[in-house]
Amino acid sequence: ITHFDLANNYGPRPGAAEEAFGQILRSDFAGLRDELIISSKAGYYMWDGPYGEWGSRKYLIASCDQSLKRLGVDYVDIFYSHRFDPDTPLEETMAALDHIVRSGRALYVGLSSYNAQRTREAAAILRDLGTPCLIHQPSYNMLNRWVERDGLLDAMDDLGMGSIAFTALAQGMLTRRYLNGIPGDSRAAQGKS
């Protein structure tokens, strides 16, 4: 395994997963940074206030800086916009991603959970800025095939964009855990997706 996919909000508290991985990176993977692909994302809730989530330039750049600090690295290989923000102009969100690459905080940018139309629009903005959109991270599995119905797979193919799906096992629904009903301690029993 050489790809470690994180987000600023992952963990039992926001940022905890990046902190834990940063410790592992320093102890178990010391000297191997150039052999690893480390990605992070921003877009979900991190702190109170008007700039604590979504896709504003202020939030994305601050989130990236905080992620780099928690990870203890100078850059991430891929930085994603974790979700489309309906209240921030797409041009602002993509300009922030472009700035993150141009400032050396990330080598590449990607999108997560954007539909086909927004993906095409975002990729065009990034292309015009000179920063290609490398990859998309949608939820995709046998029980959740929205990317096919939406046309996202075709959009990614047309754009030459790669895909790295999340929830490939449908939050555990495609594992043995649910063969005998819904376990009481499961995400499904708690009403979580």
Go through each PLM region and give its residues.
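N-terminal binding-site loop/beta-alpha segment at the start of enzyme catalytic domains
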Residues: 1-36, 40, 102
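Beta/alpha (TIM)-barrel catalytic core signal, keyed to glycine-rich beta->alpha loops juxtaposed to Asp/Glu
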Residues: 84-193
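A short, structured active-site edge motif that brings together acidic residues
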Residues: 33-46, 137-140
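Acidic (Asp/Glu)-rich catalytic clusters
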Residues: 24-37, 68-72, 98-102, 123-130
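Active-site groove signature of glycoside hydrolases
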Residues: 68-88
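Short amphipathic alpha-helices and their capping/turn segments at secondary-structure boundaries
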Residues: 18-32, 64-69, 151-160
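Active-site mouth loops of central-metabolism enzymes
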Residues: 45-61, 82-88
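Glycine-centered flexible beta-alpha turn that most often forms the glycine-rich phosphate-binding loop
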Residues: 4, 76, 109
